[in-house]
From Swiss-Prot:
WD repeats lie at residues 67-108, 115-154, 159-195, 214-248, 254-286, 307-350, 358-392, 414-491, 519-628, 642-703, 808-865, 874-946, 951-995, 1009-1032. GO terms for biological process: exocytosis; Golgi to plasma membrane transport; protein transport. It holds the Pfam family LLGL. It is a peripheral membrane protein. May play a role in vesicle trafficking and exocytosis. The keyword Cytoplasm applies. It comes from Danio rerio. Keywords: Cell membrane, Coiled coil, Cytoplasm, Exocytosis, Membrane, Protein transport, Repeat, Transport, WD repeat. This is Syntaxin-binding protein 5-like. It comes from the Eukaryota. The gene is stxbp5l. GO terms for molecular function: GTPase activator activity; myosin II binding; syntaxin binding.
Length: 1159
């Protein structure tokens, strides 16, 4: 049996029988040369399974659809709950070289129910959440990954409000029926003490008071609980006597209640836009009712106002006037008024307008004790799509500059790129350029949310995240040490003229609202050359400069359209090039042909967008140098670009789509190659397909409507082949590009997908083709777009033989061998297609700088073909020692810098040639090729397949990359079924296979990307970026939310005030609510659910030796300090008592012998 297993393992990880090549991975030209066997290579692989572990590190961006807000005033940690059940907690990070960027932590309720309310156990490292499924959860924050310790599910009542007094172990829970229950925080079990609604109100009252909307204990007496009902009824309940002290019946509905710190009065906000003040001495009627924004009309009545949803009533020592802060309350006189937050301080009223509706707000105060002067210093305002903190200590109420990246979603994110271990000087340069455009007027004080600690370990190399957006903007983010700070913003739309009303039709057929949406990004950090692919089938090349420049942008236009026969047979006509017009190769842009040049007004040889053709002043930063656009051909818009690669050392740019491939020399501004995929094969086409020219008119194919209308579950789709589809006789070969497929929609965004408009006479569907550029013109539901893949509808291997179109799915420039007979590596372009074919195109590039600017670059397709299963996704190159071979690059130089005669500006190139020190393989190197189905390692130049591994049979790979981890190299793959797989190189031995996501959606598939150092990221919601690590070493860099901090002591009230005006009675909640006196609650009322993180959380909390010692030390210090203070107070009282006794004795002796009439 063991021998049989070894044979099976050898079939997947061993080299082929014929080391010189096989029909599946051989070449059509050249003579096979001897290739080493895997044993002869003897590459020592250091990576083991123990080096890998999947772990979420940090989530950036604004929480999607926020619902609740909470703050711990001692730990200074902020928490935001969302509609999807997520919790974002915001600790803070401080680095001397990074300033104080924000870091946040994310946790998720497994039920996915919306978070209605949150309560911190102040300075205890715990959080209570109330969810829409009527469940309470207790979260432990005393560990690196917050976990649920207990849950309590209410079965018969719905939770509406929760209140947890400071330093109390009993939680008050109000319900929709008007009842108030009490929960023990430590055991998470209901107490038998219940305040029923019919006991809270008078017996003579016939109507139900409504749900509980407010609960709070009196600052003057903790034994009194104020209960607010929605109908306007307010009850002060005496917890000891189990009866109501007073009841208030008000005409208007109540939304919130806030106490004065002395406990003598409280304020209510109402649905008519009014604020009512109540005095505890006289509760018959409010002693003050105000309409802050209600004007008095001619008839003397107040105009109607919107409800005041929340009010906060806070006092300050420095001012006799209190702060009254509330949201809402504006009059109905103006439609479309922006949401406001009003701050009333004395007679001054300040109205702050917000960009989005207010979800919740909270006033941050200096003390956690409600019976002390509050001293408010900031207001945290949670909006639907933003997060604002207002400084209350300054008269103009400025806002704080937010260290968290809340504007990731300023425009919907359409693509992402992640670069680790960047050049160290790139981040300061980008920051210095971007800092010039930052807003001013922020508060000068430090950000008030300053809790938590975070460690970054030894890996603090520079990291940059680049996001592309639907409006054509590009954002560069500093992602060093799991932070995210905005560095620089680039607007690609400035390259083009604003389209006129009559010219909108050119891009309207391609995209409805966002003609500048970014599909793909290619960046060379060393040379700082940046390329952007837009949805309107255009590529923009940028160079970085620290100086202003006045330049004219060069524009190149390509006719990359081709039509082929539906069914190809060997008896068809000869190959005919589909680019008969040589003008497509002209280095100068062609003038757009007017639409009236044909009787049918067919658009031809015009781009979707018009590039500015005048002198443009460009500020420092990235400056556009070249624009490459694909043209309309015979009334058909260009196919969108599916892949892109640039190489700064070669000065070349390559792009591909569903029709073919183009290579551009951006130094000489010329087009070197513009061919269909079939023309690249020449006579080496393994399927013997033929092109057809001239193009024929396309007919409507109604049978394709089921491609997008039917929502098919992902589980069914995973069992079908993604490599071929048969729909009405046409073949579709999907790919897994990160960019959106087709011209039908712009991906990503809270508003859902944007659909295309069809021009007159256009068929509802184009011919079936590769999914890299599949066009869908019928409406697709947002759920289908985000949560399912429209992949194969049938499985047939023979359909490949009938494939009529082949998309270029990946490109990469490298120093490699274009032919088997080559003895030295030369510049090559590796091309991968949707049929699993790999073409190697050698190039001849002049080495002298002057010749490079003048002599042409020769590109000669040789017909070299390698084959894999599924669309080709990624290339990687290793030397014979197993080390990664990086692509050559040009060192950055500022082309617009002032001329320096001592330092002539010459191109400085850095080459990484394959190592030839290994005698086992001579001068060759290894090529790693990964497709949707399998991965292969070829030895070059013999093109022998040394290793092959079938990655998946039931699903397909969405994203793959060759990355460096722990000073070694591996192949990382992300599959459509949510699995993350790691394979060793070059042996392709599986090291990790984890089901990370149970169900993936198109947003994740479009934005998921790996990078070096064992990290990856994806867009987990329209507004959030999730970063993960698959490295064990990186998993240890998580921070801690809870830090041991001494709880501030209550203020000393003074001897006389405490003796005469204080609360003489002590309130023991344990005695009142405990099982001994209150009994047990009904089991059918709520169900206790032990949390999975209970035992693990206790172990993790107990396992932190340093934290335990620190807590023990603080506890000892607190105990010793309190004992010392007690001793001092005792001595002081004894001294005072002796003094009092002495004075009393002297007074007695003096007055003893006096008569009564002598006094």
């Amino acid at each position: 049996m063991k021998k049989f297993r070894k044979v099976l393992d050898g079939l997947t990880t061993s080299s082929p029988v014929n080391p010189g090549g096989s029909p599946g991975c051989g070449s059509a030209a050249g003579t096979p040369s001897a290739a080493p066997t895997p044993r002869e290579l003897e590459i020592q692989e250091t990576l083991m399974s123990e080096h890998f572990q999947i772990c979420k590190t940090v989530r950036h961006g604004f929480p999607y659809q926020p619902t609740a807000l909470a703050f711990d005033p001692v730990q200074k940690i902020l928490a935001i709950g969302s509609r999807s059940g997520g919790i974002r907690m915001y600790p803070f990070l401080s680095f001397p070289h990074l300033g104080r960027p924000g870091v946040d932590c994310h946790s998720q309720h497994e039920s996915g129910a919306a978070v209605l309310q949150m309560q911190f156990l102040i300075n205890e490292g715990a959080l209570v959440t109330a969810c829409a499924d009527d469940t309470l959860h207790l979260w432990s924050l005393r560990q690196r990954l917050p976990a649920i310790l207990h849950s309590l599910k209410f079965n018969r009542e719905r939770i509406t409000f929760c209140h947890l007094p400071f330093q109390s172990k009993w939680l008050y829970v109000g319900t929709e029926r008007g009842n108030t229950h009490i929960v023990n925080i430590e055991s998470f079990i209901l107490s038998g003490y219940v305040i029923m609604w019919n006991k809270a109100i008078e017996l003579s009252t016939k109507t139900h008071p409504g749900p509980v909307v407010h609960l709070s204990d009196s600052p003057k007496d903790e034994g009194k609980l104020l209960i607010g009902f929605e109908s306007g009824t307010i009850v002060m309940w005496d917890l000891r006597a189990k009866r109501a002290d007073f009841r208030i019946y008000y005409d208007e509905a109540i939304h919130s209640v806030s106490w004065h710190h002395e406990g003598r009065q409280f304020m209510c906000s109402h649905s008519d836009g009014s604020l009512s003040m109540w005095n505890m001495r006289n509760t018959a009627k409010p002693f003050q009712v105000t309409f802050p924004h209600g004007k008095t009309q001619r008839d003397g009545r107040k105009e109607s106002c919107k409800p005041i949803l929340k009010v906060e009533y806070k006092t300050s020592r420095n001012s006799s006037e209190a702060f009254v802060i509330f949201s809402g309350g504006l009059s109905y006189d103006k439609a479309g008024r922006r949401p406001t937050l009003t701050i009333m301080h004395g007679k001054a009223i300040t109205v702050l307008e917000m960009d989005y509706p207010i979800v919740d707000f909270m006033v941050l105060c200096e003390t956690p004790y409600l019976n002390e002067v509050q001293e408010p210093y900031a207001v945290v305002v949670l909006l639907e799509k933003d997060f604002v903190v207002v400084d209350l200590t300054q008269s103009n109420f400025p806002i704080f500059e937010n260290p968290y990246p809340m504007d990731v979603h300023e425009s919907p994110v359409t693509c992402t790129a992640y670069f680790a271990d960047c050049p160290p000087d790139i981040i300061p340069v980008l920051y210095s350029i971007g800092a010039k455009h930052k807003k001013t007027g922020y508060s000068h004080k430090e950000w008030p949310v300053s809790g938590g600690t975070w460690t970054v370990g030894s890996q603090t190399y520079p990291e940059i995240i680049i996001t592309g957006h639907a409006d054509g903007s590009i954002k560069f983010w500093d992602a060093t040490a799991i932070t995210l700070q905005m560095l620089y913003k680039l607007k690609t739309s400035k390259v083009f003229e604003k389209p006129k009303t009559g010219d909108m039709g050119r891009s309207a057929d391609l995209v409805e609202e966002d003609p500048y949406a970014v599909q793909m990004i290619s960046w060379c950090p060393q040379s700082r050359i940046f390329c952007v692919v837009g949805i309107s089938a255009h590529v923009i090349l940028y160079r970085f400069s620290k100086h202003d420049a006045n330049t004219i942008i060069t524009s190149l236009e390509l006719r990359l359209q081709c039509e082929m026969e539906d069914v190809i047979s060997p008896s068809d006509t000869e190959n005919t090039p589909c680019f008969s017009d040589p003008s497509g190769h002209s280095p100068q842009p062609q003038p757009p042909s007017p639409r009236s040049n044909t009787p049918d007004s067919v658009r031809d040889s015009i781009p979707c967008l018009k590039v500015k053709d005048r002198m443009i002043r460009m500020p420092p930063g990235y400056q556009a140098e070249l624009v490459v656009q694909l043209l309309w051909v015979d009334g058909e818009p260009p196919q969108q670009i599916t892949c892109l690669d640039l190489n700064s050392a070669y000065g070349l740019l390559a792009l591909g789509n569903c029709n073919g491939l183009a290579v551009v020399d951006y130094l000489q501004k010329t087009i070197l190659l513009c061919m269909s995929t079939l023309e690249l094969y020449g006579s080496a086409d393994p399927f013997q397909r033929l092109t057809r020219s001239p193009r024929k008119n396309r007919q409507s194919t109604s049978g394709l409507t089921e491609l997008s209308d039917n929502q098919v579950s992902l589980d069914l789709e995973r069992s079908k082949s993604p490599t071929s589809d048969h729909v009405n006789g046409h073949c579709t070969s999907p790919t897994s590009q990160p960019c959106p497929s087709g011209r039908a929609r712009v991906p990503g965004g809270p508003e859902g997908p944007r659909l295309a408009r069809r021009g007159p006479g256009r068929p509802p569907f184009r011919k079936a083709q590769s999914a890299a550029c599949m066009e869908v013109s019928l409406p697709v539901s947002s759920l289908t777009e985000e949560n399912s893949f429209s992949r194969s509808r049938s499985s047939s291997v023979s359909s490949i033989d009938r494939e009529t179109k082949e998309a270029v799915t990946t490109l990469q420039f490298a120093e490699s061998y274009g032919r088997k007979s080559d003895s030295l590596p030369t510049p090559c372009l590796w091309v991968g297609t949707s049929l699993g074919l790999v073409l190697i195109i050698p190039m001849s590039i002049p080495t002298d700088e002057q010749e490079r600017q003048e002599d042409p670059v020769t590109v000669a397709p040789t017909g070299t073909v390698l084959m894999l299963k599924g669309s080709v996704l990624r290339f990687g190159f290793l030397d014979c020692g197993g080390a990664l071979i990086n692509s050559p690059y040009e060192v950055w130089r500022d082309q617009h810098a002032p001329d320096d005669p001592d330092r002539p500006r010459k191109r400085k190139l850095v080459n990484f040639s394959p190592s030839s020190s290994q005698e086992a393989c001579g001068d060759g190197h290894l090529a790693v090729v990964c497709s949707e189905r399998q991965a292969k390692v070829f030895y070059m130049p013999s093109q022998a397949c040394l290793y092959v591994h079938n990655i998946t049979e039931s699903s397909f790979v969405l994203r793959a990359d060759v990355v460096s981890v722990s000073n070694s190299v591996c192949l990382a793959c992300f599959c459509a079924n949510g699995h993350i797989m790691i394979l060793s190189l070059p042996s392709l031995r599986p090291l990790l296979d984890v089901s990370y996501l149970p169900l993936t959606d198109m947003r994740i598939a479009r934005t998921f990307c790996f990078t070096n150092g064992g990290q990856a990221l994806y867009l987990c919601s329209p507004t959030e970026i999730q970063r993960i690590t698959y490295s064990q070493e990186m998993c240890e860099t998580l921070g801690e939310l809870f830090t041991p901090i001494e709880t501030p002591e209550a203020q000393n009230r003074g001897f006389l005030k405490g003796f005469f005006g204080g609360n003489a009675q002590t309130f023991d909640r344990e005695e009142l609510f405990g099982e001994a006196s209150a009994g047990k609650a009904s089991r059918s009322l709520a169900q206790h659910i032990p949390g999975q993180g209970g035992i693990e959380g206790m172990k993790a909390a107990a396992g932190g030796v340093v934290g335990d010692l620190a807590r023990a030390r603080i506890a000892l210090d607190e105990r010793g300090q309190r004992l010392g203070e007690l001793e001092e107070r005792t001595a002081l009282m004894m001294t005072s008592a002796e003094t009092f006794s002495k004075h009393a004795h002297e007074l007695m002796l003096k007055c003893k012998d006096k008569k009564w009439y002598q006094f």
